[in-house]
């Protein structure tokens, strides 16, 4: 094995957010954080980052069929020096009815909170950038929102997305970054296999 190629692959995985690590040893964890591989949210208002996090709520292997489509529009300047970005998120279940018929609960999951067998239940958390905020402007009936939470001073919009075959979950929201932001808003979204299926 070529060590240079391995290091390049590891760096690519870290930079793309596909390779994250954790260590119980504080010194080792400090190295992981220094590499940018800890997965920790950004707390720097000058380099704003929106976090779009999904957790499998189906208790299943269903996420193989999850497609994530995220879009972000042009920023609008605000009087206080902050900027607001319009964003939208669409979650689609790419499983076919034939695949559903041939599957079982190991694939589709058994959480009683699911609306139907084809419901890919996703726990949705939108993390606002440091010093910024998120305002939900619209969502369809496939998204159930809960009360916002706070994590390390960041606003977290919480909810559940019911992603059924032919019935995607859709949510639109505005993300306002701090007036201290000197960079454009970046977005962290978990990887899926939608490009490899």
Region locations from a protein language model:
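Lumenal/extracellular ectodomains and adaptor appendage modules
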Residues: 1-197
């Amino acid at each position: 094995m070529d060590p240079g190629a391995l290091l390049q692959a590891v760096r690519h995985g870290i930079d793309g957010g596909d390779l994250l690590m954790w260590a119980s040893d504080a010194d080792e964890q400090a190295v992981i954080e220094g590499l940018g591989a800890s997965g920790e949210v950004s707390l720097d208002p000058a380099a704003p980052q929106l976090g779009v996090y999904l957790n499998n709520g189906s208790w299943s292997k269903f996420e193989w069929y999850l497609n994530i489509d995220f879009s972000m529009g042009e920023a609008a300047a605000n009087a206080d020096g902050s900027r607001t970005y319009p964003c939208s998120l669409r979650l689609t279940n790419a499983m076919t009815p034939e695949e559903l018929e041939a599957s079982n609960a190991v694939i589709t999951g058994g959480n009683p909170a699911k609306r139907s067998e084809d419901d890919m239940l996703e726990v949705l958390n939108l993390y606002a950038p440091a010093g910024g905020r998120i305002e939900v402007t619209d969502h369809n009936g496939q998204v159930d929102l809960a009360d916002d939470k706070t994590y390390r001073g960041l606003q977290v919009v919480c909810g559940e997305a019911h992603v059924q075959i032919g019935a995607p979950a859709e949510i639109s929201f505005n993300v306002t970054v701090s007036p201290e932001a000197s960079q454009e808003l970046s977005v962290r979204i978990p990887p899926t296999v939608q490009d490899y299926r």
